Amino acid sequence: MTGPEHGSASTIEILPVIGLPEFRPGDDLSAAVAAAAPWLRDGDVVVVTSKVVSKCEGRLVPAPEDPEQRDRLRRKLIEDEAVRVLARKDRTLITENRLGLVQAAAGVDGSNVGRSELALLPVDPDASAATLRAGLRERLGVTVAVVITDTMGRAWRNGQTDAAVGAAGLAVLRNYAGVRDPYGNELVVTEVAVADEIAAAADLVKGKLTATPVAVVRGFGVSDDGSTARQLLRPGANDLFWLGTAEALELGRQQAQLLRRSVRRFSTDPVPGDLVEAAVAEALTAPAPHHTRPTRFVWLQTPAIRARLLDRMKDKWRSDLTSDGLPADAIERRVARGQILYDAPEVVIPMLVPDGAHSYPDAARTDAEHTMFTVAVGAAVQALLVALAVRGLGSCWIGSTIFAADLVRDELDLPVDWEPLGAIAIGYADEPSGLRDPVPAADLLILK
């Protein structure tokens, strides 16, 4: 291959730093490490557990020893430290904190501290790493890299591992894009989190119960490009796992209704038939009276049939408007609005079918029964529009067939009691659009 390799292809040592004190707020971490590891050399990587940095920087919070009270405070601190909750599992919260770190409990930790304390992460771990690096250079005359670590879980895999939350003096990432492997294959997306690999390796020496919060990785070819651990964080817009599964499903449910927009310009991309069929199947679960199925969707799949129907409807609409006395230019503008049904990749006509409707001897109840069935079909239409939207398909409901019911039945050879309730243009939107804003209820929600 060509280009620098992050691996050493030689022996790497991981050395414990023995004899460090129990750190307390105000302690000089660089002085303690220099005293315990005077053997540090240029090019070493000093790997430090974030907990001792937190202790030295006074990031300890007094806590009650009563387990319930301690847990209550811990949860309050998590709430304070987190900027958002990604996922919940029983009592465990996966959060993003102000640093952009995604981990359990926003880094609030009660391990390896006194029972009357809880620890928070350092305010700026990258700055802490730079300070420690400068202090070791001043005291020992060596140029080292520093990695500050914390324990994190991983998506897809059980168990935790240490990762870098602060870094100074090394390239935290190695991007292999464009580099060729020994077989001549170009690497496309490979980017190695070098600082995280160092953090995980050092944890094999530091452990969790060894009272060894600092280790030194020796023999690794360090290159300093000025990057810090912040470069390891993937911003939310680029994160494929921005939410936990349950939370993503919940957000999807909340946004489903707002995805529906009236789309009037479609791309030429074909619409997969199975998506339309699946959306119709969901739409038919809409509420209906008397356990009936009053909705039918007529899918105009044959281009000639669609064109013939729309041409006849256009002629009728133009004739009606002429009878109304509208000027020719106004008529053509009104008629042109129906062009969407010609242009849309797919068109579906919702129908009211009175199967199962109750018969009454009086007009009032007969009209009410018809209204009830009309509402049911309207619910199915809205359900279809939403079902299409959640599948990435745009749609627009057009009322035109209501004004030409006899014509529609005749052209499509449908029973005389089937009532067209508009037409639905379907396709992929020509331009993407975001969620609709909810309409303020205000005067539209009447309270009695």
From Swiss-Prot:
It comes from the Bacteria. Coenzyme F420-(gamma-Glu)n binds at D320. It catalyses: oxidized coenzyme F420-0 + GTP + L-glutamate = oxidized coenzyme F420-1 + GDP + phosphate + H(+); oxidized coenzyme F420-1 + GTP + L-glutamate = oxidized coenzyme F420-2 + GDP + phosphate + H(+); oxidized coenzyme F420-(gamma-L-Glu)(n) + GTP + L-glutamate = oxidized coenzyme F420-(gamma-L-Glu)(n+1) + GDP + phosphate + H(+); oxidized coenzyme F420-0 + FMN + H(+) = dehydro coenzyme F420-0 + FMNH2. Gene3D superfamilies: CofE-like, CofE-like domain, NADH Oxidase. GO terms for cellular component: plasma membrane. A divalent metal cation 2 binds at T151. Binds 2 divalent metal cations per subunit. The ions could be magnesium and/or manganese. Keywords: GTP-binding, Ligase, Magnesium, Manganese, Metal-binding, Multifunctional enzyme, Nucleotide-binding, Oxidoreductase, Potassium. Residues 245-448 are annotated as: Dehydro-coenzyme F420-0 reductase. One of its GO terms (molecular function) is oxidoreductase activity, acting on the CH-CH group of donors, with a flavin as acceptor. This is Bifunctional F420 biosynthesis protein FbiB. It comes from Mycobacterium tuberculosis (strain ATCC 25618 / H37Rv).
